[in-house]
């Protein structure tokens, strides 16, 4: 905890020095003490009745902050308070309470939310329906709750979150919702059909490929890739000429999925257009075309030769994509080209070679993976191990050897696999479990805990050993690991030990300063080799996240790091010092889930699980409603949006600076 306190103070210091003193006037904050205590409770993940009762006596703004805080504290005592705030005189408070109840995931809140769904304030009703979707309510019960409202009002409250109800009955509702004249409601109806599609929605999805809204065309194409058939390829083909990149990218992915799934053959009439898209000036389109082209590589000499040439002559990111595409398509030159890439000087390309080798399978790919397993880069070793374990279900000895790797990420991957596969007893794995969790690299530790719990379910003879390990993990160690171990014990029907506060090292004075520094939005520039992206940081909605981001930026933490994840028409992600999605600053911060939405240009905190954020952030390239209420939104791109579409995998972040 001392280390975390020092880290926080350093971050505050970095924020203070990133601008002159005159740039940071003291902000007068009403009810500063109460707001600071609420932030302290969120950070400690604890409920305090005295603080709650004091906040309830405050004005509407303070009561709204209370509702937000209670939604971020996993304590059922907060549910009763929030249900009372659902009938507050102020609409802003009722909205915050409705959203917060959805975040608490307590099914007993459903009764109060059904009533709130028909609140006089539409937004409160929308948020109540969203919360009911998160809590697993039946859509028929939501409809019954909305019956007293006019029909247009019912649609306005139901459609934005209809996709959250995982029932086949939503298909008919969404199809009716498509008739709404409000373009946004029409789009949300289409999203509900597309996000987790049911096969019976196929006829409607096919029609939506010609919708006037490019978002709808893209969503429909994606859905057809999941539930469509080979008969859908002719309907997808026109989207290769779509004027918007979203539908084009999703049609390429859908075709690749249908072919890879054995539902279709690679159509010859796509070849010429696909070949042209391999040289498209838009990086996202080009990347998607390269990925899809693997499905044509073996049957089309033109496509196969183009991909083979790209592995040698393209930019590094293109070479890696082409290499994996050739391996996935079983092209005859793939093994030779993968072996060459395995000896490349570029770490990212060697990691891609490991992925390709895994797709080649054994024994050909195994020879390449054997060499990469001893690579100097932990990133390459981790990729080689993951590929090897995926290709060979009998790779127990490989995993055991990896437990001795000096890198925690490699050890974590091995431990996760060994815990899931009964080739080693849990008693044998216990020493490795103790050392797998490292702050800032929590994904491996969380995966190991879940794998141990899964072993308890699948191997009755080891249930006792698994429970003992989980009890040990729940009793000590980092908060997120203790919480996960306790949750897994509960699922196994075992007593869940009391959860000690997450953060004990910071006093109220630290939180007062954070509240004062984050009472207003701040602005930063993310300077990249492709141009500058200007982001307004929504500090009032996510103060801990914003102060952390500003502190890291002020220290120069982001200087020279890369965008290690680029998914066209979805997100770009950066901020990992390891460059592979497993790294962080050496600590984690609390989630601050809020009501800001993941439209294009939203900036969110990347996670490996609840409360595991640190330095990695992502920016959405298109609207992503399914991310709403699941990841902290802490910023919005306000200038330089065109740069987002030019970012390539591996592009560098030159610097992140705060600007006026």
Give short role names for the model-derived ranges.
Residues 15-17, 407, 424-427, 431-660:
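Cyclophilin-like peptidyl-prolyl cis-trans isomerases
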Residues 14-30:
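Bacterial Sec-dependent signal peptides at the C-terminal "C-region" and cleavage site
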Residues 105, 120, 150, 541:
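Glycine-/small-residue-rich active-site loops that bind phosphorylated ligands and cofactors
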Residues 50-58, 83-87, 111-118, 141-148, ...:
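HEAT/HEAT-like alpha-solenoid repeats
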């Amino acid at each position: 905890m001392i280390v975390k306190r020092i880290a926080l103070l350093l971050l505050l210091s970095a924020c203070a020095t990133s601008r002159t003193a005159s740039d940071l006037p003291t902000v007068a904050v009403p009810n500063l003490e109460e707001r600071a205590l609420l932030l302290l409770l969120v950070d400690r993940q604890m409920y305090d009745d005295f603080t709650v009762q004091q906040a309830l006596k405050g004005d509407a703004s303070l009561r709204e902050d209370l509702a937000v805080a209670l939604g971020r504290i996993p304590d059922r005592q907060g549910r009763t308070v929030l249900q009372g705030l659902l009938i507050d005189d102020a609409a802003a408070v009722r909205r915050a309470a409705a959203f917060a109840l959805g975040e608490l995931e307590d099914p007993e809140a459903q009764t109060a939310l059904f009533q709130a769904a028909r609140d006089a304030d539409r937004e409160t009703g929308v948020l109540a329906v969203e919360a009911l979707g998160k809590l697993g309510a039946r859509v028929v019960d939501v409809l019954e709750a909305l019956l007293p409202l006019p029909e247009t009002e019912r649609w306005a409250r139901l459609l934005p979150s209809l996709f959250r109800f995982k029932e086949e009955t939503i298909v008919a509702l969404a199809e009716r919702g498509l008739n709404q004249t409000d373009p946004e409601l029409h789009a949300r109806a289409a999203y509900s059909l597309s996000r987790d599609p049911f096969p019976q929605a196929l006829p409607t999805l096919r029609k939506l490929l010609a919708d006037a809204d490019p978002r709808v065309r893209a969503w429909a194409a994606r859905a057809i890739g999941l539930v469509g058939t080979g008969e859908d390829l002719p309907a997808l083909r026109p989207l290769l000429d779509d004027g918007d990149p979203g539908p084009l990218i999703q049609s390429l992915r859908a075709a690749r999925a249908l072919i890879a799934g054995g539902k279709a053959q690679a159509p010859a009439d796509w070849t010429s257009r696909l070949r042209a898209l391999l040289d498209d000036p838009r990086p996202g389109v080009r990347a998607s075309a390269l990925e899809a082209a693997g499905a044509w590589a073996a049957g089309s000499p033109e496509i196969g030769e183009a991909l083979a040439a790209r592995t040698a002559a393209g930019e590094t990111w293109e070479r890696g994509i082409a290499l994996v595409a050739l391996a996935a398509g079983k092209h005859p030159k793939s093994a030779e080209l993968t072996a060459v890439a395995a000896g490349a000087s570029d770490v990212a390309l060697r990691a891609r070679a490991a992925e390709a080798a895994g797709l080649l399978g054994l024994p050909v790919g195994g020879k390449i993976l054997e060499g990469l397993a001893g690579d100097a880069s932990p990133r390459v070793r981790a990729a080689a191990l993951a590929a090897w374990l995926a290709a060979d279900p009998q790779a127990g000895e490989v995993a055991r050897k990896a437990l001795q790797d000096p890198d925690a990420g490699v050890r974590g991957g091995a431990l996760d696999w060994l815990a899931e596969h009964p080739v080693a007893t849990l008693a044998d794995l216990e020493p490795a479990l103790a050392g797998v969790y490292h702050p800032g690299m929590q994904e491996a530790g969380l995966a190991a805990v879940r794998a141990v719990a899964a072993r308890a379910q699948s191997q009755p003879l080891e249930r006792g050993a698994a429970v003992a390990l989980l009890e040990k993990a729940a009793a000590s160690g980092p908060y997120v690991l203790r919480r996960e171990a306790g949750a897994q014990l509960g699922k196994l029907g075992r007593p869940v030990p009391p959860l000690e506060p997450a953060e004990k090292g910071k006093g109220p004075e630290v939180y007062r300063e954070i509240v004062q520094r984050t009472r207003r939005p701040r602005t930063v520039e993310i300077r990249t080799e492709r141009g500058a992206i200007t982001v307004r940081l929504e500090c009032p909605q996510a103060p801990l996240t914003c102060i952390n981001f500003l502190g890291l930026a002020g220290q120069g933490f982001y200087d020279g790091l890369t965008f290690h994840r680029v998914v066209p028409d979805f997100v770009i992600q950066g901020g990992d010092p390891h460059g592979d999605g497993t790294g962080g600053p050496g600590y984690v911060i609390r989630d601050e889930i809020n009501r800001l939405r993941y439209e294009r240009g939203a900036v969110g905190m990347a996670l490996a699980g609840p409360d595991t954020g640190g330095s990695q952030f992502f920016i959405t390239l298109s609207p992503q409603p399914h991310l709403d209420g699941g990841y902290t939104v802490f910023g919005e791109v306000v200038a330089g949006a065109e740069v987002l579409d030019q970012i390539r995998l591996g592009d560098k972040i030159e610097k992140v600076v705060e600007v006026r």
